Amino acid sequence: IAGGVLYVADISVVRTFDAKTLAPKADVVIPGATFLNDVAAGPDGKIYVSDSGLKQGEKDFEPTGTDAVYVIEKGKAKPVAKSTELGKPNGLLVDGKTLYVATFGSGELYTLDAKGKKTDAAKLGKGALDGIVLLGDGSLLVSSWGGSEVLRGKAKAPFASVVTGVKAPADIGYDKKRGRLLVPRFLEDKVEVFEVK
């Protein structure tokens, strides 16, 4: 949610809704996108969306080569970065001027600069990363399907498990007021809540 608008990634379109009434607003079509995944808002009003570069195959997801991170400004999307080197970008987080990317394919956490250059890349845990949130102390929480866990750490520093045994932990959320981590268990259609301060 940014500026009273709810943004929702839907395969190749970012749908927008009035955050109060939920009335549909304009759609932002992203030509060539195959698996729009996470959406994050920057403090400057820019909206970022990841394309994990996947499609449903016969038995599992298959790569499409459309791996990208887009920025949406004034209802138009343009790529910040577009390359299979992005490693199937999934979770996004904007902290000030820093754009963090958690990848499902390469299991990396990295930042993208304004020109789309990948920096500070680090492999985390057992990979298959999904959601990412920022805590008040500046540390990050990142969910990992590969490790069935949520990891905590600071950029350029080691990460450690803070929640384990959560199969398919998807795009996590954090309630700063109550110190609660919300972990959707994608394959089980449920959300678990953990205290993390």
Name the predicted role of every residue range.
Residues 23-29, 76-83, 116-123, 157-163:
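A short beta-strand motif characteristic of beta-propeller blades
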Residues 1-5, 13, 68-78, 94-97, ...:
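Flexible "stalk/tail and boundary" regions
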Residues 18-23, 72-76, 112-117, 153-157, ...:
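Short loop/turn segments that connect beta-strands within beta-propeller blades
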Residues 13-15, 67-70, 108-110, 149-151, ...:
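A short loop-to-beta-strand structural motif that recurs across blades of beta-propeller domains
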